Amino acid sequence: FRGRIYATEETANLCSIMLKDCAHIQEQEAQWKTRKNARAGLPPEEPIYSVADADACLKRFRPCPMGEKIPIAEGITVRFVNAGHLLGSASIEVFLTEGETTRKMVFSGDLGNRDLPILRGKDYVAQADYVLIESTYGDRLHTPCPDPTAFLAKCIRETLDAGGNLIIPAFAVARTQEILSCLH
């Protein structure tokens, strides 16, 4: 891929950290597997992408402010709309104009389901001609945790009072952001 990558400013900032970090981990794992493969007479292992690939990718990013219409090609304009899922998450409105007719397509991944201290709630799209949306959890309701900060504080206090060590695994970016916000 040699084109531009349009992303919200927050997503571009997050990617500058995450892409390189993930590439570094992949390179380390590939080195480990290559050493293991060499002992078994197997070919070397290659990472899916390298730190150099991540750096090249990051140069293609075009950070875009949330809510502004951005022309990307003849007759095609896009606008990022806050999805409220994690910092920088967005639905994207694509405006396709042919002659006097403009159609709007909306693409979205996860949508936030509540206001969090570090996030605004999601913005709603008023109208669209076509909508494509991720729906992994579309068939169920999430029961809200009454007070996640109080629950986390209780767990921390109990662990420290018992002389224990606290480990909080949070593999998803959104959950990590929520936990860090609660701890703050």
Locate each region found by the language model.
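His/Asp/Glu-rich metal-coordinating catalytic cores
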Residues: 3-178, 184
